[in-house]
Amino acid sequence: MMLTKDSRLKKVYKAIEPFIEEFGISQIRIFGSYARGEETPQSDIDIIVDIGKQIGIYQFIGLKQDIEATLNKNIDLFKPNTLEAFIKDQILAEAITIYEQR
């Protein structure tokens, strides 16, 4: 279920929506400048996806490239377990959940 009314974040959700079932995505969160509303035209989008299915690195890279092509913007795509431990708590505290499986 999409959890945002912010048009910027809806656009990100819509770019990922086609892959939710294919990859078993249970949650999508945005952090960084987009989450704070401080993005510039040059900003990338920082996205955390909880993926329920086992996928290889090439599938993950393909997912990232497909989202970038749809948004016409660079993204940084993370799974929660790949966030650096020393900043993970800070990232998760500021992250905005834009989709959560119900």
Predicted segments, located by residue:
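Catalytic core of pol beta-like nucleotidyltransferases
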Residues: M1-Q27, R36-P41, G52-R102
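Short hydrophobic/aromatic beta-strand micro-patches
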Residues: I48-D50
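N-terminal beta1-alpha1 ligand-phosphate binding loop
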Residues: S33
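Conserved histidines in hydrophobic membrane contexts and catalytic metal-binding motifs
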Residues: I30
